[in-house]
A protein has these predicted regions:
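Class I S-adenosyl-L-methionine
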Residues: 31, 35-38, 84, 93, ...
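Short beta-strand-centered segments that line the small-molecule binding cleft or hinge
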Residues: 80-110
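Conserved N-terminal structural module of periplasmic/extracytoplasmic solute-binding proteins
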Residues: 1-82, 101, 145
Length: 186
């Protein structure tokens, strides 16, 4: 609580890709969410603290282990779910109403928010991950048949080795920035 009589909650967030496009700086996206939340909840004040990708993960872990974590944290599923599994986070199942799940309209996003039957993460956004391949190269290397739904890590390794044997460099990673793609933080 703050001196104003309002309940104060603290929100830690990493920068998101939309901030790079607005020119308004870090926290622009979050501030728009806070404004809407505070309007709907006039007795609550939200204090935003943006954290960076270099020191943020350690800061989060230290705070959670010390019992001084923020009230709200915007982070990647991998860390969040692990904290939940370790008993460090509140169970959010009561927020996963039938209407909410219907509104999310994606069973995988709902599943990613949970460890077992307990929700530890409330999804407010999602980002697509994809892989593109050169079909001609795969055919020349004789491994196009391995690239199919349900392919395994072993299949993927076979594809990489076959491409390399044909003289191709079998891999590329595009990273616009840590705030815009998870590939650099996963």
């Amino acid at each position: 609580s703050s001196d104003s009589g309002k309940t104060e909650i603290t929100w830690w967030a990493f920068p998101v890709f939309t901030q790079e496009k607005t020119g308004d700086g870090v926290g622009t996206y979050e501030k728009s969410i806070i404004a809407a939340f505070e309007k709907a909840n006039p007795d609550v004040k939200v204090k935003l603290e943006t954290i960076d990708f270099k020191s943020g993960p350690e800061k989060i872990t230290t705070a959670i282990e010390a019992g001084t974590a923020p009230d709200v944290l915007f982070d990647a599923p991998g860390r969040i779910i692990q904290y939940g599994k370790n008993g460090k986070l509140a169970d959010l199942n009561d927020l996963f109403t039938d209407d909410f799940v219907k509104d999310v309209n994606n069973e995988n996003i709902v599943k990613a928010s949970k460890a077992g039957d307990k929700a530890y993460m409330y999804p407010i956004s999602s980002a697509p991950f994809y892989m593109a391949m050169n079909k001609k190269m795969l055919e020349e290397a004789g491994v196009a048949n391995l690239v199919k739904e349900g392919w395994t890590t072993d299949d993927f390794e076979k594809v990489l080795k076959a491409l390399k044997a044909k003289g191709y460099t079998p891999g590329s990673l595009f990273s616009s920035g840590q705030g815009g793609d998870q590939g650099t933080r996963a």
